Amino acid sequence: MDTFQLDSRFKPAGDQPEAIRQMVEGLEAGLSHQTLLGVTGSGKTFSIANVIAQVQRPTLVLAPNKTLAAQLYGEFKTFFPHNSVEYFVSYYDYYQPEAYVPSSDTYIEKDSSINDHIEQMRLSATKALLERPDAIIVATVSSIYGLGDPASYLKMVLHLDRGDRIDQRELLRRLTSLQYTRNDMDFARATFRVRGDVIDIFPAESDLEAIRVELFDDEVESLSAFDPLTGEVIRKLPRFTFYPKSHYVTPRETLLEAVDQIKAELKERLDYLRNNNKLVEAQRLEQRTRFDLEMILELGYCNGIENYSRYLSGRAPGEPPPTLYDYLPANSLLVIDESHVSVPQVGAMFKGDRSRKETLVEYGFRLPSALDNRPLRFEEWEAVSPQTIFVSATPGPYEAEHAGRVIEQVVRPTGLVDPEIEVRPAMTQVDDLLSQIRQRVAKDERVLVTTLTKRMAEDLTDYLGDHDVRVRYLHSDIDTVERVEIIRDLRAGAFDVLVGINLLREGLDMPEVSLVAILDADKEGFLRSERSLIQTIGRAARNLHGKAILYADNVTGSMQRAIDETERRRAKQIAFNEAHGIVPKGVRKDIKDILEGAVVPGARGKRKGVAKVAEESGRYENELRSPSEISKRIRQLEEKMYQLARDLEFEAAAQLRDEIQTLRERLVNV
């Protein structure tokens, strides 16, 4: 399946058909930059999916954070179920970079925790780009960081066809050079096991399928994909390509060449340090570098091998490092979502990384060539970026300067118009807000309140709670998963009011929110800029009765521009609806649908039993009222749990065990 096939029950509507036509036209005309100025809820992702389906080009979609990347990944998987939709974000759950603090003589060693599932998805993403013309990669700004050189990476692949002649020992040696390890007991990703002439290999980029290679007299007699848990053969294969375990795997001859170059640089640097009477730094550098070289010669890699990436990729000093962009085919397309946030991120990465590494080089912890293990500079990123579409409700100055064409998508397919805006005095903002909340809660609608400081958000939450308002507070200390759960609870009606400081960054759909209250809207600054105000006001744009109240004593320039722009959009939307006889309809979205991709996409790595368990838990609160109902439910779940255990689905069985325990606790309290 080499062509993009868009699968959707919806047809483009509102401003979408014209926006899609203009974007496709611009791409075919060779425009290097275009901007899709799409209001909240106008279906920007659907428009981009239609563009991809029409131009039939591999696409990199850049998102500003993992939460939005995961949401986009889920949406594109739905739109393109028959194509290769991949996810490329930082694979660190925790990352403490190597650093040195001269003032206290403190060396901080690199410490990290790698998420195995995301590492597998990164490898799957590069494999898709190298093998398939129908790849869509959803990535974050981590895509501008150094990655192994694609030419070296491709040299290392192991390609097997049925009927190939290969000695068993040679096959095992090739697998070892890909950094696969032999493990006959624990069969996991990037391992292989040997049973006579049958070799089972678990590809590094796979999550559910392993490959069985059957040899007969040094000939590949059979290749088959099988389930590593049950051993069931899924299908026979005519051929298969095994990719390395890491993007940094390098051919042996390149390694030997690199070691010689590193030794030459080490000698030069040691002479410099000793001539400048930096004896401690010289001894430190020599000891660390020689240890790394020994590891590279013996194992093919070492901890921190990325610091020698200039030599491993054969690049000249100062040349940009190889990144995900080097893996993109020549005819690729780049889509930058929420570009007003994503583009400035790209520019900021290089500077912070550089200052930390310069200190390490100066004090003898790294060779000067380590400075070339870095993210791309902004101008380098511009040079390697293919044709680009910026997507934002509030494009920034960079987009305004570079966009060859600005395409507006203001009219929503649902006919919904932008929220009404009202300015009210800040003097009585809290009391007025309380009365507004009571009106909305009476209609079973939700409210977002944004404040300027953490202290005020906490105080307001306490005040509203004291007045019997069901309220929660969203702040920066809450991690991504919990943040998603809070938004789920708001939509589900577990509480009615969400107070925060920078709520616009969520980018998640909340159709139940009918009122956005912005306190101290006249305090100019980052949180009350024109762009921030428009984004925050947009949170109420998915509700039929959407309204935004700006509490302010003066109307600032930013406020006036935000109000004027929103009114301009409202006028255009209302005129379109009247001209076409459209009656606005409220958005109704399944809560689980919106959040499907909002946590790191791991669902595809689960088997059926696990997925079924999660569906049940949300029903308890509403359905199970009496002790007899709860007891009946416990018996049903116990039967399922024992069946899953018999089927060796222990992860799913454990989840059911936890559900049963929760129900038993409820039974005691009923």
From Swiss-Prot:
Domain Helicase C-terminal per the UniProt entry, residue ranges: 429-582
Sequence ranges assigned to domain Helicase ATP-binding in this UniProt record: 25-412
Chain sites annotated for binding ATP: 38-45
Protein localization: Cytoplasm
BP GO annotations: nucleotide-excision repair, DNA damage recognition; SOS response
GO CC, any one term: excinuclease repair complex
Protein name per the record: UvrABC system protein B
Organism per entry: Pseudomonas aeruginosa (strain ATCC 15692 / DSM 22644 / CIP 104116 / JCM 14847 / LMG 12228 / 1C / PRS 101 / PAO1)
Gene of this entry: uvrB
